[in-house]
Curated annotation (Swiss-Prot):
NCBIfam families: pulA_typeI. This is Pullulanase. The gene is amyX. Belongs to the glycosyl hydrolase 13 family. The lineage of its organism: Bacteria, Bacillati, Bacillota, Bacilli, Bacillales. It comes from Bacillus subtilis (strain 168). The keyword Mitochondrion does not apply. GO terms for molecular function: pullulanase activity.
Length: 718
């Protein structure tokens, strides 16, 4: 990049507004009138406003002749001094968006005879594509400007395996950039790569998933999942680890894919697998990263591939992994990061269309609601198109089954609804959910895709942090405790969560329908439940802490809504007290498969809870109206919640179900309603292999969950 020296500056800030900035010391020399010059003529600029700034003098001018984007313009002062006209705030106006919105295909479109390269760069005055091949000499092809600010060129020949970069001239400066739409990239994402469509056959097509509340989501990080020395997997830290079947720990316990299948979850959610920064793909074990540093949104990450130097390998192995999971009845959710990029100034977005894809504050500075230095301006039409195009691509090319949206609240509602429409048309039955936090980005509250606006986004789920904190205590206050940790003040909030957070008694609904409530007590973010509890209750022994975590898991897995489990939570995962392990070592982040063996009984307990939920629709009521009709709270005390699912003849094979959650080590006797005998399926000691008949009262001995049922066939149990 060559630095341009300018005697003064001029910017297009609206379709016919040009701002001229004169150095303060040159104010008496470079004076109005100003003229706008094109290659063939010039026009007068009328000064509408003028201001004295700290080091410059500002003139706001109006042109009767709108700027022709894609052409070189200059502004000349009365002194004869000239400067090139740069793209300013006009890039962020609705008029610009409307004039240059393009609904066609972008990127490299391959055929065996030729490849068409297209890039959307409406502010650019010139563009080219630079092609190279490891075994051949490179060439640069000038691109032609088409309508809507698209530059294109068709290059003949079979370009499979060719590397390419776009060269874009904005504001008189040439920049090389990777294609925003690159479907494959070289090692560490330095160039895009043209690949012919592969011949991957999906051998296990799954029917559209029935309903979000039927899901049990299991979140994991590819490297965490397999890197432990006792994981039993050969391809540690790689896509292929999840293609290995029947793996075991050293002592013969199931691990890997076999373990997840045995656990009974329905969906595996993977932390980002698109190309990200933070890990050198040539030396992947030298650093660690969760993957929330997005570089290239359409291309798979190379550090998880067996050969990061071969762009095809990462595509093939990722597809093999997804296909294998499908063969075993497991669906795949991708964690995607459309709210920010790794580094704004180096991103293909900024290099291609400076200032367009990111939000700016009222002073024209990049906003930082995400906390990482930039916010994607999803409300702009080409950003909206990009997000929808990307989601549809992963559905169609990689056959994934849903998306978890990082910092969903940064995005705007219209984009989320547009994306949902395109995505569900591409693949019905997918899950779409995310973090609906209300963050400080310059977007009106009513436009944010935040939890508070859930009623306007049917079909979109939200992480329910209120339910989470009611169960375990405030996530951001280490010593804070929730119901499962002995804080009886949270009982009512927990009961609201159990009822799907969609309105219980006089409480205002958090979400309008249970399918929009993602119920969890632990995720990759923040402390694990075990670590949080160890800080909050340092006096308690491990046995009692295990009981409390089992209680928390039972609350979530039996609640109305969509349950979500963090991998290893079922065997009390610890990160040694590290709160934010996004770039901590493998020793902190790895899934410790030794604990899977140590806590076999607890894993079995979680498996039985999942099995119970899947077997009985009463725990998966599909609407708020159904919950109001079939769920009632029987007891709500400081350390005891009892609720009943009833009138289930048309819902479940069980007629009646009672669940009791008890958070005190004391023993209590709880009286059954209506003196009807129930079968005791589960108590704090675990599941009963032969449920016994209970009359009048049931003993609740210590911390844990009691499950009773009434069926026409009293021998029926999960």
């Amino acid at each position: 990049m060559v630095s341009i020296r300018r005697s003064f500056e001029a910017y297009v800030d609206d379709m016919n507004i040009i701002t001229v900035l004169i150095p303060a010391e040159q104010k008496e020399i470079m004076t109005p009138p100003f003229r706008l010059e094109t290659e063939i003529t010039d026009f007068p600029l009328a000064v509408r406003e003028e201001y004295s700034l700290e080091a410059k003098y500002k003139y706001v001018c109006v042109s009767d002749h709108p700027v022709t984007f894609g052409k070189i313009h200059c502004v000349r002062a009365s002194s004869g001094h000239k400067t090139d006209l740069q793209i300013g705030a006009v890039i962020r106006t609705a008029a610009f968006d409307d004039e240059f919105y393009y609904d066609g295909e972008l990127g490299a479109v391959y055929t065996a005879d030729h490849t068409v390269f297209k890039v959307w760069a409406p502010a650019a005055t010139s563009a080219a594509v630079k092609l190279s091949h490891p075994n051949k000499s490179g060439r640069t092809f000038q691109m032609t400007r088409l309508e809507k600010g698209v530059y294109a060129v068709t290059v003949t020949g079979d370009l499979h395996g060719y590397e390419y970069l776009f060269c874009i001239c904005n504001n008189s400066e040439w920049m090389e950039t990777v294609d925003q739409y690159a479907k494959a990239v070289t090692v560490n994402g330095e160039k895009g790569v043209v690949l012919r469509p592969d011949q991957m056959k999906w051998t296990a097509p799954l029917k559209p998933f029935s309903h979000p509340v039927d899901a049990v989501i299991y979140e994991t990080h590819l490297r965490d999942f397999s890197i432990h020395e006792n994981s039993g997997m050969i391809n540690k830290g790689k896509y292929l680890a999840l293609t290995e079947t029947d793996t075991q720990t050293a002592n013969g316990s199931s691990s890997g894919l076999a373990y997840v299948k045995e656990l009974g979850v329905t969906h595996v959610e993977l932390l980002p697998v698109n190309d990200f920064a933070g890990v050198d793909e040539e030396k992947p074990l030298d650093a660690y990263n969760w993957g929330y540093n997005p570089l290239h949104f359409f291309a798979p990450e190379g550090s998880y591939a067996s050969n990061p130097h071969d762009p095809q390998t990462r595509k093939t192995e990722l597809k093999q992994m997804i296909n294998t999971l499908h063969q075993h009845g497991l669906r795949v959710i991708l964690d995607v990061v459309f709210n920010h990029v790794y580094k704004r100034e180096n991103s293909p977005f900024e290099k291609t269309v400076p200032g367009y894809f990111f939000r700016h504050d009222e002073c024209g500075m990049p906003s930082n609601g995400t906390g990482v230095g930039n916010d994607i301006a999803s409300e702009r039409r080409m950003a909206r198109k990009f997000i929808a195009d990307c989601v549809v691509y992963w559905l169609e090319e990689y056959n994934v089954d849903g998306f978890r949206f990082d910092l969903l609240g940064i995005l705007d509602i219209d984009t989320v609804l547009y994306m949902k429409e395109k995505a569900t048309k591409a693949k019905p039955g997918i899950l779409l959910f995310g973090e609906g936090w209300d963050l400080a980005t310059p977007l009106p509250h009513e436009q944010k895709a935040a939890l508070a606006n859930a009623p306007r986004m049917p079909g979109i789920g939200f992480f329910n942090d209120m339910f989470r904190d009611a169960v375990k205590g405030n996530t951001f206050h280490l010593k804070a405790t929730g119901f499962a940790l002995g804080n009886g003040e949270s009982a009512q909030a927990v009961m609201h969560g159990i009822a799907g957070s969609s309105g219980w008694k006089a409480l205002a609904p958090i979400v309008p329908e249970p399918s929009q409530s993602i119920n969890y007590v632990e995720s990759h973010d923040n402390h694990t439940f075990w670590d949080k509890m160890s800080f909050a209750l340092p006096q308690e022994n491990d046995s009692r802490k295990r009981s409390r975590q089992r209680l928390a898991a039972a609350i979530i897995l039996l609640a109305q809504g969509v349950p979500f489990i963090h991998s290893g939570q079922e065997f009390f995962r610890t990160k040694q007290g590290v709160e934010n392990s996004y770039q901590s070592s493998d020793s902190i982040n790895q899934l410790d498969w030794d604990r899977r063996e140590t806590f076999k009984e607890d894993v079995h307990y979680i498996r039985r809870l999942i099995s119970l939920r899947k077997a009985h629709p009463a725990f998966r009521l599909r609407s708020a109206a159904d919950i109001q009709r079939h769920l009632e709270c029987l007891t709500l005390k400081e350390h005891l919640i009892a609720y009943r699912l009833y009138d289930l003849d048309e819902v479940d094979e069980w007629k009646d179900i009672i669940v009791i959650h008890h958070a005190s080590p004391d023993s209590v006797e709880w009286r059954l309603p209506n003196d009807i005998p129930y079968r005791l399926l589960c108590d704090p000691s675990g599941f009963q292999e032969d449920p016994t008949e209970i009359k009048k009262t049931v003993a609740v001995n210590g911390i844990g969950t009691v499950i009773l049922y009434l069926a026409s066939d009293l021998k029926s149990f999960a």
